[in-house]
Amino acid sequence: MVAISMREMLEAGVHFGHKTRYWNPKMKPFVFGSRNGIHIINLEFTVTMLNNALSELRKISARKGKILFVGTKRAASEAIKEAAGNCAQFFVHHRWLGGMLTNWKTVRQSIKRLKDLETQSQDGTFEKLTKKEALMRTRELNKLENSLGGIKNMGGLPDALFVIDANHEHIAVKEANNLGIPVFSIVDTNSDPDGIDFIIPGNDDAIRSIKLYLNAVSAAISEGRSENSVMQKEESLIETK
């Protein structure tokens, strides 16, 4: 079972919050104090809350649940894509389009268009077009891939969201809340923890911290998927006896 220690968190700088003047008072329970005008996060809470979140994500994965990673700011973007890929899950790392969850019917049509363009780019259709038309379709394909490439095979709404920076991704959090989809999120000292089902107080800016969370989450989800495979094998063995 994946678990993160306080030492690992300290080494990754998880305890460093934002400047004290930018804090959200709702984060007060998770603040240890301040140093040089920076809030210090109480890692005793973070260790427990992150490990609880990992346990829950593993259970969701073991039930074949779909988990959507969300991190569109520059520091998180590539790491989000990599982590989701490592555990065969889904991601939004470029820009959150309003209605991505709450207007899924429209999003599904855009995904269909993306897949159609992908097929056209591979089956020689683009080569039969004028240079201008081919260029326009290539641009459309790239734009759709950037926005929807990480969810094109999700096949419906996710069962949970894992978010880096609740503040930056507040639209995604609100949409998930409206649909009753549980939200797991890193919440820094400048963020509002309301609407987050599984709060993980921590630094949401440092790449080392972000990678620590994502590696742990990815590993926990992979563990859950492995548990599911073992259970299926056991069930099939029982049926054949």
Swiss-Prot record:
Keyword Ribonucleoprotein applies: yes
What is the gene called?
rpsB
Lineage, broadest ranks? Bacteria, Pseudomonadati, Pseudomonadota, Gammaproteobacteria, Enterobacterales
Family (UniProt): Belongs to the universal ribosomal protein uS2 family.
Q: Name one GO molecular function term.
A: structural constituent of ribosome
Protein name, as recorded: Small ribosomal subunit protein uS2
- InterPro entries found in the cross-reference section: Ribosomal_uS2, Ribosomal_uS2_bac/mit/plastid, Ribosomal_uS2_CS, Ribosomal_uS2_flav_dom_sf
Q: Name one GO biological process term.
A: translation
Please name one Pfam family that this protein belongs to: Ribosomal_S2
**Cellular component aspect of the GO annotation:** cytosolic small ribosomal subunit
Q: Which UniProt keywords apply?
A: Ribonucleoprotein, Ribosomal protein
